[in-house]
Amino acid sequence: GYDCTIYNLDFPDVIDMRHRWVPKADNEIDLPYSATDHEWLTKVSGGKGVIAVAPGVFYYLPIPEVAALVDAFGQAFPGGRLVYETESPMVMRGSEKQIARHGTPASMPFKVKDPYKPQDWSDAVRDYHVTFNFLDYLTDEQRKQIPSQYRILFGFFERIRGIYVVNMGF
């Protein structure tokens, strides 16, 4: 058996497309909702704890909607964690231009000037960490396997605080 349940939160058509390529495991539950439709929070069992990972999700949402989600998540899952990565406004503007150049323009309204501001979005936030270097998650041996141009790029983004991971506990 499995020690955890994985909830796939996404739009119904995206969930269907995912299942064409990746079979659903026995411990997975699909939640066909938008992240901003807080009804999905009532479908998640928090009995064993909840860790929500939102890679690449918040870029496309307005700040007030993410702030409301952070607060609702914190209220629904005391002791839970929410982890996401994002970019500084300057880097995100560059990302928008890059995406538009390749034919898929998309607005990225989640431009938070202060990476520490989201900890104020909910009274339920108990701890809050920001990591500005994605290589911090790797051992020295693993870092050596990353091509040098990428290590340099990650170092640059760390210096300008251009991309970062937020890890908040409730």
Where does each model-flagged region fall?
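Alpha-helical subdomain
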Residues: 1-170
